[in-house]
Amino acid sequence: MKYIGAHVSASGGVEFAPVNAHEIGANAFALFTKNQRQWVSKPLTEDSIRLFKENCEKFGFAPEYILPHDSYLINLGHPEEEGLTKSRAAFLDEMQRCEQLGLKLLNFHPGSHLNKISVEECLDRIAESINLALEKTKGVTAVIENTAGQGSNLGNEFWQLKYIIDRVEDKSRVGVCLDTCHTFTAGYDFLNDYDDVFGEFGEVVGFEYLRGMHLNDSKKELGSRVDRHDSIGKGLIGFAFFEKLMKDPRFDNMPLILETIDETLWPEEIAWLREQTQ
């Protein structure tokens, strides 16, 4: 079964996210558990935690199909100690918020070397950052999102995801989220080589590590390494790819999350994607 949703607003409190997801016809969703543009946020209140859990139960959202996203400020591969320490503390806080909410996944962008350290040194720092957070938490899987490779962002090549996973001590608590826009603009031509691209992912990383996907069309061309999302079917990826993806059983039983640019289209996009599973 396909679990399809979008990255919904948690404005006013995390407890509103499941309500917003239900209203667009979703059976999965993503959210920020805190303000994603601030380093420090107020702790979650007991009321918010209770209401979030109640609303998830009320609208039928299981933790396996909720994919929270961490703050954009965090860089787990930061080349400088101050930035690294700050990022690690913020990431741990995000993991602990997921624990409090009974969530099982935390999606994050791996990190950037900022042209100050080598790719491998940065990847080593990312893996160590994950290990430190996993040691201090229970039950939450760190889900590495592949990137477009914009600027000095890492995670745009499958081998880099594998490199990080290889260095994470608790393999049961690390996973991957594939973003369709990022995969395309990173240079993986799944329009012409669908079987080869996902075959390569299976061989290099392994589908056992795939915990979710972000379903986004792309405003930018294949291999551009520029991250600009578009609405489903309106960008350079197009409808046919998503139709194929929806019929592919390898993507069953995980959150498939829209981060497309026009949220007024989300109910329509979710309904269309669901139709393609028939």
Swiss-Prot record:
Single GO biological process annotation from the record: base-excision repair
Binding annotation for Zn(2+) 2: E145, D179, H214, E259
Cofactor annotation comment: Binds 3 Zn(2+) ions.
EC number: 3.1.21.2
UniProt-listed InterPro entries: AP_endonuc_2, AP_endonuc_F2_Zn_BS, Xyl_isomerase-like_sf, Xyl_isomerase-like_TIM-brl
Keyword Ligase (UniProt): no
Family as reported in the entry's similarity comment: Belongs to the AP endonuclease 2 family.
Name of the protein described by the UniProt record: Probable endonuclease 4
